[in-house]
Amino acid sequence: LINLFLLGKKDIHLHSLGAYCEYVSSVCDTPIPNNYPAIGRDAFRTATGVHAAAIIKALKTKKDKWLADYVYSAVPASELGLQQKIDIGPVSGKSNVVFWLEQRGIEPTEKQVEIIFQYAKQAKHTLTENEVYALIDMKSDFNASAILKDITETA
């Protein structure tokens, strides 16, 4: 269906495809892999600095969802009723951190951005929401390695 849509068959509406796939997944007792194209949980998620920066620029500066969807993704998220997701990880830039905070209604401070950014650089994974929220309230200098160890041990 997605390929037909991308080839120009515009009478195909893809907004219900995810829900349909979830239903089939539950009936067949076969989970959809997180990295599955178009319908997997991570299909429109990125934490990579350059890719995320381009999407952020399209969404913030140009206010252009079309550009973010059609140029930076093989399948447009909006056609599936979804949106691009920017996460924070070891290869993220500071723009990922700022965008992530702003998307959640948090006005980022330089200190918050720096703490989260430095923590992410030492992590070996994409940060979870719990990890980022735990870092948001930190006010003083810190040892990112010690915090990383502490947060991952309690998770």
PLM region spans:
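Glycine-rich and small/hydrophobic secondary-structure elements
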Residues: 1-11
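A mid-to-C-terminal "edge-of-domain" accessory segment
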Residues: 9-155
